[in-house]
């Protein structure tokens, strides 16, 4: 039987490449995207490669789309095996802390933190029926000279704590779901205006890291994995 995965923000970038690589391994792809035209176009591209895929409308800024997607998947794809929380927004990556507007910070938090929280909470009951996995794309906690976008780090890094807390809750209450985070490294995408450099990796390389962890059959519950060489695990 084909295993099924839901990937948010999967119409482009590392999300789409992850969908393609998992599809090549025989997974059925539920492609989460806000925009119907772009989502269906991405599905068509996958189908042309022989991959079974379906567009699912998910906008992390709109809780109703999350709940509607969960209701649909619970009835039509109740054997969902994995959720990849990939979607996120970066805001102005060059703005200093004193230049960031509160409205922008709230907008990013709505997607990067609250939206991902609602995805985890809403889809856990479906995944628990299938001993499923929740993989969250995340970033390093500490800014450095190479990577220090204030709004993005401030709204994305709390996800790491949330992963650990959900993992602890799942283990304590014997909920058969694994939740973990993956930091695939610096990936050249439109999120960073296609930044390049010796520390940056292609979407193909980044997706390989994600696929490897998702399918490795090791228990990563509550852990954050950083793509160095090999993966480093933060407990």
Question: Would you name each region that the model predicts?
Answer:
Residues 1-30:
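Canonical Rossmann dinucleotide-binding motif of NAD(H)/NADP(H)-dependent dehydrogenases/reductases
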Residues 7-8, 85-86, 133-139, 178-183:
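Structural signature of the Rossmann-like NAD(P)-dependent dehydrogenase/reductase core
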Residues 25-41:
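Conserved glycine-rich Rossmann-like NAD(P)H-binding loop of the short-chain dehydrogenase/reductase
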Residues 36, 57-69:
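The beta1-alpha1 cofactor-binding region of Rossmann-like NAD(H)/NADP(H)-dependent oxidoreductases
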Residues 51, 72-83, 91:
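A glycine-rich helix->loop->beta "capping" turn
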Residues 89, 96-109, 117, 128-172:
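Catalytic loop of short-chain dehydrogenase/reductase
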Residues 177, 181-182, 189, 193-235:
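C-terminal helical subdomain
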């Amino acid at each position: 039987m084909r295993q099924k995965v839901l990937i948010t923000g999967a119409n482009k970038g590392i999300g789409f490449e992850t969908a393609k690589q998992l599809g090549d391994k025989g997974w059925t792809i539920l492609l989460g995207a806000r925009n119907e035209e772009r989502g269906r176009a991405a599905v068509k591209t996958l189908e042309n490669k022989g991959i079974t895929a379906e567009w699912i409308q998910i906008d992390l800024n709109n809780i109703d789309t999350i709940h509607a997607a969960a209701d649909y998947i619970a009835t039509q794809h109740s054997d969902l095996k994995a959720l990849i929380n990939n979607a996120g927004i970066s805001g102005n990556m060059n703005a200093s802390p004193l230049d960031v507007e509160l409205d922008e910070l709230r907008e990013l938090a709505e997607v990067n933190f609250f939206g991902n929280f609602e995805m985890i909470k809403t889809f856990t009951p479906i995944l628990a029926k299938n001993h499923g996995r929740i993989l969250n794309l995340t970033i390093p906690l500490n800014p450095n000279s190479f990577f220090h976008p204030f709004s993005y780090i401030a709204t994305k890094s709390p996800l790491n704590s949330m992963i650990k807390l959900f993992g602890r809750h799942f283990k304590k209450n014997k909920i058969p779901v694994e939740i973990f985070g993956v930091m695939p490294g610096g990936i050249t995408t439109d999120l960073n205006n296609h930044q390049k450099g010796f520390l940056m990796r292609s979407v193909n390389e980044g997706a390989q890291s994600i696929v490897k962890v998702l399918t490795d059959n090791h228990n990563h519950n509550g852990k954050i994995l950083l793509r160095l060489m090999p993966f480093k695990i933060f407990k």
